[in-house]
Amino acid sequence: MINHRICILGGTGFVGHHLVSRLAASGYPCRVLARRPERHRDLLLAPGTELRWSGGFETDVLKEQFRGCTAVVNLVGILNEGNGQTFQQVHVNLVEHILAAAQAVDVPRYLHMSALHAQATEGTSRYLRTKGMGEDLAHADTGMQVTSFRPSVIFGPGDGFFNRFATLLKITPVVFPLACPDARFAPVYVGDVVSAMVRALADPGCVGKRYDLCGPRIYSLKALVEYTADLIGRRRIVIGLPDVGARLQARIFQLLPGKPFTMDNYLSLQTDSICGHNNLAELGIQPQTMEALVPGYLR
């Protein structure tokens, strides 16, 4: 086993589960922070994995969690504000705490999960702007060896994209009204994303880089929803809403429990989630297609 313990924030989520498994398979012991570790004991099946309770993400708390680690991975992010969490707190303030804590206990390496087209000033939504602010903060800190990753929508077993649309399609009768149907995505496989992160850990040449990660093909949102409906055997007429309808849907849906669609989501969709240059190839990774993988887990 490699003598480098990796501390992971957000390790109990979709990408986190896949990353812990891949790191363990590559010989890296992991320390995963969780507010409710008893709910995530499955992570302990990965050899060398330690699951720690974390009562908060303040600098002093994180210093103790990071002690003895050689790298920190931050996968924490939210798509909507609520439950006392704001984009500023999660995407910006947390990064400040991580950097301060890591430097205080001499952790040299930091991997940061950002988002495709995250830009501090030019982002079309608060989500993208705060993601950009956090990313810029990390790269501006000369005391850390930083690599960030900017994926398009990520798919794979347990994802929140195809599985979510599958659930919505199952409960929607006949007609499925879709906001922003022409928004474009290049869905990237979670296995390719975590491969990029593991390779970056081992390669000093990745320090300081910001990697855009995309799948090999581009699709409209409408095409992805129709593909999902076909896979789960639901005949639905997917009707793209005009812009005024999309805005109205967002204003109504953001008032519902769970906020299935918000105005900030709408604004994020005004920027196509596609790569100008896909950096997976630079990392020696051949991106896998959704057609080869999604049918294996979506029901």
Residue ranges and their predicted role:
Residues T167-V188, D192, A196-V207, D212:
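A conserved pocket-lining segment of Rossmann-fold NAD(P)-dependent short-chain dehydrogenase/reductase
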Residues S114, D136-G160, A166-T167:
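Conserved beta-loop-beta element that borders a ligand/cofactor-binding pocket
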Residues L9, L33, L75-V76, Y110-L116, ...:
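SDR active-site strand-loop-helix element
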Residues I2-Y28:
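N-terminal Rossmann NAD(P)H-binding glycine-rich loop of SDR-like oxidoreductase domains
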Residues R199-T262, C275-R299:
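Mid/C-terminal beta-alpha module of Rossmann-like enzyme folds, strongest
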Residues Q88-V92, T124-E135, F155, D159, ...:
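Short-chain dehydrogenase/reductase
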Residues E38-D42, P47-H97, A101-A104, L116-G123:
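NAD(P)H-binding glycine-rich loop region in Rossmannoid oxidoreductase-like domains
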Residues S148, G158, P181, A186-V194, ...:
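Conserved loop-to-helix N-cap of the C-terminal "lid" that shapes the substrate pocket in Rossmann-like
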